[in-house]
Amino acid sequence: MIAFPNAKINLGLHVIARRSDGYHDIETIFCPIDLCDILEIVSATQTKFIQSGIPMDCKVSNNLVMKAYQLLKKHYNLPEITIHLRKNIPIGAGLGGGSSDASFMLYLLSNLANLCLSIEELEAYAKQLGSDCPFFIRNKPVFAKGIGNIFTPIELDLKKYNLALVTTNIHISTSEAYTNIVVSHTPRESLTDIIHYPVDKWKNRLVNDFEEDIFPLYPEIREIKQELYNQGAIYASMSGSGSSVYGLFKKPYRPIGTFNFSIHNFI
């Protein structure tokens, strides 16, 4: 069985408060895009994990795909399998690739073992793997709050836009990004209101709070965002806590010059 776990971007990100448990409350919009990993599982005599594509610097046991397998194996009689994950979604780029892999793994295992898990059951298991993992079960635009784990579906159609995605060799861990974040207590417009403005009104309104702290540390990320605007982007932003940057362009978009980015669509 094979699946294509897709990435997501954040449209805006407000850090609302620092929590007593060390986490932060946030507000953001998750939106799925068509940049995908490839995940395949087949029955085998012994469980084995094979990874290709973008290198992953973690133990196999720490990979979210393996954690998804072990989680369901505690509750169901799963077969031994060979897992092949080809990573195309950059790691530490704010695109949710690992979370997507884990959620799609739950889908595949449910189908392979005829578990017939409902959407709600899949979401409950995904929640145990990561705060944003349940998003990839329904894979539709949502307003996310809490620690990025409380979702409200929203109507958002961006299919008439191309998304230009720029990834870098900079790896920004989520914990690193939150270390220096300054929580703003200034009243501001809700993301759920801003998102319904015309896209050409988003610039300087739809803000990612991490940019203020990340850009001085990694000025090349700021330069990428500006270059996307120079190329004619209607809106550009860093995704999540970085380091990827995206720009929205009206279709059909044809890149100017030699600026290096990939073109994607919204799902």
Swiss-Prot record:
Keywords: ATP-binding, Isoprene biosynthesis, Kinase, Nucleotide-binding, Transferase
Record keyword Ribonucleoprotein present: no
Disulfide bonds: none
Main enzyme class: transferase
Residues binding ATP, per UniProt: 90-100
Claim: ATP-binding is one of the keywords in the record: yes
An example Gene Ontology molecular-function term: 4-(cytidine 5'-diphospho)-2-C-methyl-D-erythritol kinase activity
Catalytic activity reported: 4-CDP-2-C-methyl-D-erythritol + ATP = 4-CDP-2-C-methyl-D-erythritol 2-phosphate + ADP + H(+)
Membrane-spanning segments: none
Any Pfam family the entry gives: GHMP_kinases_N
Enzyme Commission designation: 2.7.1.148
Source species, domain of life: Bacteria
GO terms, biological process: isopentenyl diphosphate biosynthetic process, methylerythritol 4-phosphate pathway; terpenoid biosynthetic process
Active site, UniProt feature: 8, 132
Coiled coil feature spans: none
UniProt function note: Catalyzes the phosphorylation of the position 2 hydroxy group of 4-diphosphocytidyl-2C-methyl-D-erythritol.
Family under the similarity heading: Belongs to the GHMP kinase family. IspE subfamily.
Protein name: 4-diphosphocytidyl-2-C-methyl-D-erythritol kinase
The gene coding this protein: ispE
